[in-house]
Structures are given as C-alpha cells and as structure tokens.
Design a protein with these regions (language model features):
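N-terminal Lys/Arg-rich, disordered targeting/topogenic segments
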Residues: 1-11
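Sequence signature of WD/YWTD-type beta-propeller architectures
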Residues: 10-509
Length: 509
C-alpha cells in the first residue's frame, strides 16, 4: 500500500479496512482516484473464479460466494477487514475482536480478545495488533497467541504496523509518537512529543518516519522536520522548515525553508528554486510543477527545467488541474482574453514538452486523469442540472452522474439519468461504455462496485426510512443480472481494481 502524509488524526492503515458505518455513508464506488490507494484502472490482480465479496445488512456482515450467501457475524460490526486474498475476515462486534477463515468452510468465528476499541492487521491477516479499552496494545495471531507490546495508547485510530508486525507505531496520551520494535522486546526506537496539528508520514515497512512538528514562537506558527531512517538509527532535523510533499518510501521530500524550495533525499538537501514556497507534486514520484504566466518550472528530484508556454493574450491565467501519480502527465487550463482551454503536458523524459490542447474549458466542473492518462471531465449547460462526460475531448455520455464513475481496463461505468431528470427515460441506469458503445445494465441503481468487467455488484431501490437505509443487492455476471439479497445497506470487496472518478464540482468545496 502506498503511504501518504496524514494529519495525526488520520494515519494510514496498512490493509484495506473500512468502517461499515463509513461504507454505508459513502456513495459507493469505493475509493480511488484519491491517490495513494492499492488500486488502479488496469491492476494485475485477478478476481477469483468464484466471485466473493462482503456486504452488510444493518451492520451485520454477510458473504456472497459463488451463488450462495452466508451470515458471517452474529451481531452488529463496527469495523471489519477482508484480507487482500479474500480468504480471511477480521471484525469487531460489540467490543469483541473476531477472526474467521473463510476459505475453510468448516471453520467457525474465533474470538481473539474482548474490550477492543481498534485493530490493525497485516496483508494476509495472520498477525493482528489491537488496542484495549485501557490503552494497552497487544499483538495476536490467528492461533490465539497474544503478547502485550505497548500501553497508554491515546486514540483508537492511531495504530499502524508493518507487514511482518515486528514494528508498530502509535500515539500516547501525552501526544508522543512512539515507534516500537516488537521483535526486540518492544524497544522504543522513536519517541517524539508532538502537537495535534503535526503530521506523520511513514514508509510501509516503518523503516522511514517523517514528522513535521508544529509549534508557536511569539504567537507565530513555526515547524521543524524530523526524519528517522534505517529503523530509527539515523535522525535528521531540518529546523524552521515546512514540508511540501513527503515520499517516505524513498526517504525524500520537497520542503521550504527561508522562502526557498528544497529537495531532500537520504540526508542530503539541494535548493531547487529561490523565492518559492509551493508547487504541485505527484503522489508516487518526486516530481514538482510550478505554473506561471510564461510556462512551467519542473523539478525531478534535484534536476530542474523551464518549459515555455505562450498564449496570445493580454493576460494569461494558468490553473493546475491534475498531475499523474508517476509525475509524467500534467493537466492544466489556460485562459486569456475570454478564451480558456484544457491542455495536456507530457513531462516524461525525452518528450518534446509541448502542451497539447484537448478541449475548450467552458462550463467544466472538474478534470481528472485515469490510471492510463486519459483526461476525464464533465460539462454542464447553463441553467441545467444535467451533466455530460467527456474523455480526451470526446463526448462519451449525456445526462450522467458525474460524481459516480468507475474506469477499468478501457471501460467506463456510470449512472445515466440520475435523479430522473429525463422523465421519458428510466432513471438511475447503470451503464458500461466500451470504445464509445453504451450498454445499459440495470435501472434504479443507487450504488455499485466493479469486481471485474464480468462481475458488478449493485444496490437498487434504496430506501431511507427512520434508522434504516437499504435496498436489493444484485450481481451482474457474464451478461446476466441475478438477485442476491434484500435490505442490504453496503457492499465491500478486498481489492478494488478500478479508478474511482469524482467529477462533482461541490466535492471540491
């Protein structure tokens, strides 16, 4: 899983693990394009031959497995984890932590511990770290063995581990960040007192920790950067500096100090631009772009270049819209004298670095990129609630829900005639668009999740009554739609291969 910088209230978990409450509240095409997830529009992950997924009915877990549904939890679940191979289920129910081997049909749920407020697990679910109500932290295995590995943990969301579970990170009640080596009798290798506004970024194996500590000097905000590497053996401090983007997997970052922009990597810092304190950064690779009226400044680690861009206008305004995770594609809009267009700029090594116009930027709500660099955006007609979806300058869908789109292996999935604005057509029709050809799957769809091109889950006819919200669950498989269950509130799968695309203007506010 890709790491990213988080405020300490939202530290990253290391496997796909969602609150059932949160899943029920989200418009369910689950996760992505908010980068940093496990998924991509063309992942190498292969779905099991027999589709398997978890769904919830009023927070009670069920599993669909090749034509049959089975109740998995006896009671309401506050949080659950389906491992990436879809073979193990871990969940909390009324304070009890449970484990179940799904692959073993004869296996029953095993209670791991009581009075548990939160947990985290490694990718295959074989090692679990959990917090008790009194703040004690335990490490457990699926065979029932447990050991205490920490104490005085302050917040049930602030617990993370590496995949071997021999290092754990957490915050204490006095707001100290602790990184402990469980394999060495819980030896504390990082102990930093930080404020509530500080940030922590960590590599997946927890060998690199980057902390930005905020504080005040004479009522003025300030910050220092602490970098721990080599499992805490090396400590570097950059005083009076602010992180622009951290890349803990690479032990690197962009930061600003004394009004200039720097690149740091493995203990060494290089100034990349004078009199500059910000830039748009790629999520996975250390690429930074700064736009201006005459072009772009691009930094790739400590290497920089200027890219000229001229627009015949008395005044030019350039607005960054998206930079790809790998830093090779940059999307922007440029306007001058009343004209505005969407441009794509290829930043990859060896390209001619010439921006290419894609479309007029008129009534565009939001622009984003798919994993294979297609430019997706929506447009509205003035005074109309209907939205049309465009890809690389071509109209692919009219009257579509632009904040509920998925993309997988060249096909787009979206809901047409959302809210029934066109009274002559069926409402909320889930549609697949492949090479410009639309295929209607089913109407009255409220939520959906793409397992693969031949397997799509849908909740239809969603009802909202008092404390209940739910609908009928269907599976679209190999061209046929099959009813699975009723009164279903949410659906989940362990690995999402698709891009989640949100073009809703209001989601940006």
């Amino acid at each position: 899983m890709k790491s990213s910088e988080k405020r300490i209230k939202t530290l990253p978990l290391l496997i796909v693990s969602l609150s059932v409450i949160a899943v029920a509240a989200v418009t369910l095409v689950l996760l992505l394009l908010q980068r940093g997830g496990d998924t991509a529009g063309s992942s190498s992950y292969d779905m099991p031959a027999k589709p398997r997924f978890i769904y919830a009915k009023n927070k009670v877990l069920y599993m669909y497995d090749d034509g049959t549904s089975e109740r998995m939890s006896e009671d309401i679940c506050d949080k659950y984890t389906l491992t990436t191979d879809s073979n193990r289920l871990i969940y909390i129910s009324k304070g009890d932590l449970w484990y179940r081997d799904i692959e073993n049909k004869d296996d029953k749920p095993h209670k791991i511990a009581t009075d548990v407020t939160a947990y985290n697990a490694n990718s295959d679910g074989s090692k679990i770290v959990y917090i008790k109500e009194n703040g004690d932290i335990f490490k457990g295995t699926t065979d029932g063995k447990t050991e205490k590995v920490g104490e005085n943990c302050s917040d049930n969301d602030e617990l993370f581990i590496n995949d071997s579970a021999d290092r754990i990170g957490y915050f204490t009640n006095d707001r100290s960040f602790i990184l402990a080596d469980v394999s060495q009798s819980n030896e504390i290798i990082v102990n930093e007192l930080i404020s509530g506004d500080s940030t922590v970024s960590c590599s997946d194996n927890l060998s690199v920790i980057i902390i930005e500590k905020f504080y005040y000097i004479d009522s003025e905000p300030a910050s220092d950067i602490y970098i721990y590497s080599d499992n805490g053996k090396i400590k570097n401090i950059i005083e009076n500096a602010e992180i622009v983007r951290a890349y803990p997997e690479k032990n690197s970052m962009y930061y600003t100090k004394d009004g200039s922009l720097y690149y740091y990597e493995k203990g060494n810092s290089v100034k990349v631009k004078e009199d500059e304190t910000w830039g748009e950064c790629a999520a996975d690779e250390p690429v930074l772009v700064i736009s201006g009226g005459s072009g772009f400044f691009v930094a790739k680690k400590d290497k920089t270049e200027e890219i000229k861009f001229s627009l015949k206008a008395s005044c030019v305004l350039i607005v960054t819209r998206e930079i790809s995770d790998d830093g090779k594609t940059y999307i922007f809009t440029a306007s001058g004298d009343g004209n505005s267009k969407i441009y794509r700029l290829d930043l990859s090594d060896g390209s001619d670095k010439t921006p290419v116009a894609i479309d007029d930027d008129t009534n565009v709500t939001r622009i984003t990129l798919t994993s294979d660099k297609k430019v997706v955006y929506s447009k509205t007609e003035y005074g109309s609630p209907l939205r049309n979806i465009y890809v690389d300058g071509k109209l692919i869908a009219e009257n579509a829900d632009s904040d509920n789109i998925s993309y997988l292996d060249g096909s787009f999935y979206y809901i047409k005639n959302a809210y029934g604005y066109d009274e002559e057509e069926p409402a909320n029709v889930l549609t697949i668009n492949t090479d410009g050809k639309e295929t209607a799957i089913k109407d009255d769809v409220t939520r959906y999740c793409v397992l693969d091109k031949d397997n799509i889950m849908m909740i239809c006819g969603m009802k909202y009554e008092d404390d209940f919200r739910g609908g009928t669950l269907y599976l679209y498989k190999d061209g046929k739609t099959v009813k699975i269950d009723e009164e279903v509130t949410s659906i989940e799968t362990a690995v999402k291969r698709y891009d989640k695309i949100d073009l809703d203007y209001y989601s940006m506010q």
